[in-house]
Amino acid sequence: MQTRNTFFWIKEQMTRSISVSIIVYVITQTSISNAYPIFAQQGYENPREATGRIVCANCHLANKPLDIEVPQAVLPDTVFEAVVRIPYDMQLKQVLANGKKGALNVGAVLILPEGFELAPPDRISPEMKEKIGNLSFQSYRPTKKNILVIGPVPGQKYSEITFPILSPDPATKKDVHFLKYPIYVGGNRGRGQIYPDGSKSNNTVYNATAAGIISKIIRKEKGGYEITIADASDGHQVVNIIPPGPELLVSEGESIKLDQPLTSNPNVGGFGQGDAEIVLQDPLRVQGLLFFFASVILAQIFLVLKKKQFEKVQLSEMNF
């Protein structure tokens, strides 16, 4: 009887442990995969400010290049590609939240004109699906289907992101017209330096919050430092906490100034933004243009034939 009770107790404990592990995994993976888009989505109603600045730049302080490629013109109710390229050196490693080094990830926000939206899966061609890979796009807001976000995703695999876009049809959407429209995009590689609440991440430089002499440096067991700065005039002490990740640049007994860097800047990533233009083309206008070209070509042909006929008449008159 006691053996059976022991068996059931062990089985119950193992079940609990497995359940807890699964819950922790799901929570951590969800928070990691959704972290970057959620920061912007929760803090800003619109990712593009009135100045034209995309809000992701508030957390990703370094400026890096970015490129977007879209067709010059598209017809209504057609699927096309918007390709966003986020270039960086694939050999670089970034500081992770735990202070260790790891590969960079990338993310992007694509701001389309009103009426443009993510193409439904049944409208995407097999060739385009192959370019998209396993990426999962989402709308910035349920009411803002024209603003798409993605990331963070592995940068080594997705430094080039293909968005499948469906163009609107003015025949069914009266607020859409055949015009030239702007498209805005922002993209980051690597982690940010500032969180939305204004606090620093461990992926940035830490400066001295007071001037004086470093009286003590304590290396923490889980990484990072605790630096005590003593004011030379009154002996007042200020403690600076450095998280795991940045490398220390100062030592005990060193005299430092206010805002002097205490650590190196470990950031190797950055944010970039760009824009492009696309024309929603009227099919009737295209047909009219083709008809015009055809009429010009026919006119040229008739002109050549008429000229040859006139030359024959002249030649026959001369022979006569």
Curated annotation (Swiss-Prot):
Q: Tell me yes or no: is Signal among this UniProt entry's keywords.
A: yes
Q: What does the record give under GO molecular function?
A: electron transfer activity; heme binding; iron ion binding
Q: Name one GO cellular component term.
A: chloroplast thylakoid membrane
Pfam families registered for this protein in UniProt:
Apocytochr_F_C (PF01333), Apocytochr_F_N (PF16639)
Q: Which family does it belong to?
A: Belongs to the cytochrome f family.
Q: What is the lineage of its organism?
A: Eukaryota, Viridiplantae, Streptophyta, Embryophyta, Tracheophyta
- Quick one: signal sequence residues? 1-35
Tell me the GO BP annotations in alphabetical order.
Answer: photosynthesis
PANTHER family tied to this protein: CYTOCHROME F (PTHR33288:SF10), PTHR33288
Name of the protein in question: Cytochrome f
> What subunit structure does UniProt give?
The 4 large subunits of the cytochrome b6-f complex are cytochrome b6, subunit IV (17 kDa polypeptide, petD), cytochrome f and the Rieske protein, while the 4 small subunits are PetG, PetL, PetM and PetN. The complex functions as a dimer.
